[in-house]
């Protein structure tokens, strides 16, 4: 492996993050929300790429993870009066559990079968959103504008509707996802995931339990996707069934391939 490659990747990543951070001081305030949404969805794509780009597994059910984080966080705020950070934490924990559970079942298959199983789970999640409309409010969804309280850090409070706060929160999410993804690929676990992508049978012959490594990759991928969904709910104060539809699983696939 080229020793300079990790350094070049780290420098490129740092350059992108610095550019995006400084961009907020150049852009007019009314563009901050647009770029905030781009960075949140880019974080979703980074999470998806751990499964597809690193491990070679194509999923059509990632909208399930994104919407799980979104709905759990949104329901905690809307129905139970939680503030933003605790609601996000609960959404993250539930997404980890769902990712592990779905992965434990879906990874018993491979290839096209895995694609179909993830699609099946994704559609089940979408139909569940419509069925349990007493909590999700069905197809229309719900807004968090009135229920969501400002984030209080010490003596300072931050409104989730403030464009500057949105931008910096989205930038922080993207930075965490990007750095974590880069650290993973440079780690021994990341090398095994790449080996599985290239030749799973040969990796098994070397003594690695590929099922557990793939389960780890799917769990981490789903968790980052759910985290992006939770942050999206808080920053844009809307939770809706459209984020659980299949097109929201296809979108990160296209972003990753492009």
Label every model-predicted segment.
Residues 1-258:
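Transmembrane alpha-helices and adjacent helix-loop boundaries
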């Amino acid at each position: 492996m080229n020793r300079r490659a990790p350094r070049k990747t780290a420098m490129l990543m740092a350059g992108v993050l610095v550019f995006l951070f400084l961009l907020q001081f150049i852009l007019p305030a009314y563009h901050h929300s647009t770029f905030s949404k781009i960075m949140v969805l880019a974080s979703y794509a980074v999470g998806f790429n751990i499964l597809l780009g690193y491990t070679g597994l194509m999923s059509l059910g990632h909208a399930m993870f994104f919407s799980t984080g979104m709905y759990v966080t949104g329901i905690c705020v809307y129905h139970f009066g939680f503030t933003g950070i605790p609601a996000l934490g609960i959404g993250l924990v539930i997404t980890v559990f769902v990712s592990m559970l779905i992965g434990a079942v879906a990874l018993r298959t491979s290839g096209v079968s895995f694609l179909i199983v993830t699609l099946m789970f994704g559609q089940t999640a979408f139909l569940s959103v419509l069925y349990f409309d007493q909590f999700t409010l069905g197809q229309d969804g719900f807004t968090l504008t009135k229920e969501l309280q400002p984030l209080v850090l010490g003596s300072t409070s931050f409104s989730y509707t403030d464009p500057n706060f949105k931008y910096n929160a989205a930038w922080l999410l993207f930075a965490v996802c990007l750095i974590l993804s880069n650290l993973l690929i440079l780690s021994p676990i990341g090398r095994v995931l790449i080996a599985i992508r290239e030749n799973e049978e040969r990796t098994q012959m070397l003594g690695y339990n590929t099922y557990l490594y793939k389960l780890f990759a799917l769990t981490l991928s789903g968790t980052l996707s759910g985290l992006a969904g939770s942050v999206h709910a808080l920053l844009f104060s809307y939770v809706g069934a459209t984020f659980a539809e299949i097109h929201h699983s296809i979108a990160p696939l296209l972003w990753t391939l492009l």
